[in-house]
């Protein structure tokens, strides 16, 4: 009988837990998210804006970072197999950052800084061993996104749904606060007015070098982790709910 009376409490506890982690807003979106390979991360380890270098990770994957005040960063390393010649895969590295907006209907829009996006395309069987390095600018629209606790890994999971509703591969929370390059225009284009090139929202090469150098020096000091502001957003609530369910089930079976 005690087990039967406990079941409504257990159900409410699980509902409360799911409600606590189900808010799809800028606060819950903030952080660095990485795909299953766990090898691709945004930040200075992927792109060096001073020397214009895209750094190839150990494995393909994608990563997105978001701040609470509306900035994003994107890192992609994709490899496409060549079915006609397995020794000729194509690979592409893509870096973008800029601003994002969450609409009232839950749509997520990413608008990159046009001059900062970079792409490195490698086609070893057709480019004579010389990869193509170019600017890249592609706005992105995600119809919706969902943040939850992954049932298998027990960590936060971000599911982005593309403009047509098809799901992107799931991303998992790697850092919070996010690991990102400065949220300003890193490589402003030259203008006739020298003050415009180092104006508001941009930095000079010298100051940019100092910023990136500091980020690199602090790379292994800023392994940010989730900060919990209360019991309702704590992962311990998951274990408490699981334990209570287990106890309730045992009492129900033996009552």
From Swiss-Prot:
InterPro entries for the chain: Rot1
Spans within the Cytoplasmic topological domain: 252-255
Single GO MF annotation: unfolded protein binding
Function: Required for normal levels of the cell wall 1,6-beta-glucan. Involved in a protein folding machinery chaperoning proteins acting in various physiological processes including cell wall synthesis and lysis of autophagic bodies.
Name of this chain's protein: Protein ROT1
Organism: Vanderwaltozyma polyspora (strain ATCC 22028 / DSM 70294 / BCRC 21397 / CBS 2163 / NBRC 10782 / NRRL Y-8283 / UCD 57-17) (Kluyveromyces polysporus)
Annotated signal peptide: 1-22
BP GO annotations: 'de novo' protein folding; budding cell apical bud growth; establishment or maintenance of actin cytoskeleton polarity; fungal-type cell wall biogenesis; protein folding in endoplasmic reticulum; protein N-linked glycosylation; protein O-linked mannosylation
Residues on Lumenal side: 23-230
TM stretches of this protein: 231-251
């Amino acid at each position: 009988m005690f087990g039967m009376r406990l079941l409504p409490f257990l159900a409410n506890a699980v509902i409360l837990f799911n409600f606590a982690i189900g808010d799809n807003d800028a606060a819950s979106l903030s952080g660095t998210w990485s795909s299953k390979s766990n090898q691709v991360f945004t930040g200075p380890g992927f792109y060096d804006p001073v020397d214009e270098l895209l750094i190839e990770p150990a494995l393909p994957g994608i990563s997105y970072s978001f701040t609470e005040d509306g900035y994003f960063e994107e890192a992609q390393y994709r490899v496409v197999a060549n079915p006609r010649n397995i020794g000729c895969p194509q690979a592409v590295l893509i870096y973008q950052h800029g601003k994002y907006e969450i609409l009232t209907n839950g749509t997520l829009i990413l608008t990159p800084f046009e001059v900062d996006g970079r792409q490195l395309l490698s086609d070893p069987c057709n480019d004579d061993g010389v990869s193509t390095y170019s600017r890249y600018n592609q706005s992105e629209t995600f119809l919706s996104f969902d943040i939850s606790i992954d049932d298998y890994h027990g960590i936060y999971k971000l599911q982005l749904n593309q403009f047509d509703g098809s799901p992107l591969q799931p991303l998992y929370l790697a850092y919070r606060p996010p690991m990102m390059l400065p949220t300003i225009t890193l490589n402003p284009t030259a203008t006739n007015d020298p003050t415009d090139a180092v104006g508001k929202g941009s930095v000079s090469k010298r100051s940019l070098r100092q910023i990136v150098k500091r980020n690199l020096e602090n790379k292994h000091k800023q392994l940010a982790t989730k900060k919990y502001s209360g019991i309702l957003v704590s992962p311990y609530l998951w274990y408490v709910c699981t334990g209570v369910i287990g106890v309730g089930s045992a009492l129900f079976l033996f009552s």
